[in-house]
Amino acid sequence: MNIKNKLNIIKKYKYVSFDVFDTLVYRNVNKPEMIFSLVEKVAKENGLISPKCDFVKDRIMAQKLAYEISKYQEINLNEIYACINDQYLNVKQQLKEMELKIELDNIVPNKEIKEIYNYCINENKKIIVISDMYLSTENIMSILIQCGYKNINNIFISSEYRARKSTGKLYKIVQNELGVKNKDIIHIGDNKKSDFLMAIKSGIRAIHYKCNKISNLTPKQNIYRSEERRVGKECRSRWSPYH
């Protein structure tokens, strides 16, 4: 990515908005759903679930079901675990807390975007975070703070507002709540539809960030590559939670 070129574009905007996953931060796994595989591994090692349990499949199916029955555009983590297989009935809370911890433990900042963020801070830009994600605002802020993104002016998470970037509705909420004019805001994100096309459709200038995740991770951070085949089919489902 040509950082200098992006900074030249950003400099005229008062508000700079960032996507979270695969933009501000990366995970130390090749696929987002590999987090579920790590939860399964730790849960089995600690005797929390049976060795026969296929938690990865059950967790993905619970998320799919939660979307299907929800009356809102977005769901949250509590609703996902409310839909998980009854065999986890007595350990739902422990599994949910384990997932959040493993999520946090496997997050690293994106150095390229961090450079843009630091420029925005130095230039006194208003920093906004907009994410389509089932985690809570508190969860997302913990991730951002851990990665050094401490100066966030406003944060809009789809699970809290029950509206998504991918439909354009969350962008409208941002515009209305902040009273920001379209000419004063620009959004940066990796998802071509959610972060680029829908932002533009909503009247917001956008930069499509083409992430190169693997090159940003060290060999140590890629230790879970060998597990990818096991969950690959499920990982390619349309229910991927990260946009």
Predicted regions and their residues:
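Acidic, Mg2+-coordinating phosphoryl-transfer loop and its flanking beta/alpha structural elements
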Residues: 188, 193-221
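Active-site neighborhood of HAD-like aspartate-dependent phosphohydrolases
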Residues: 3-57
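Catalytic cores of eukaryotic secretory-pathway lumenal/extracellular enzymes that build
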Residues: 163-164
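Short, acidic loop-to-helix structural element flanking the phosphoryl-transfer center
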Residues: 72-128
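Conserved Lys-Pro-Asp/Glu-containing loop-to-beta segment of HAD-superfamily phosphomonoesterases
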Residues: 168-193
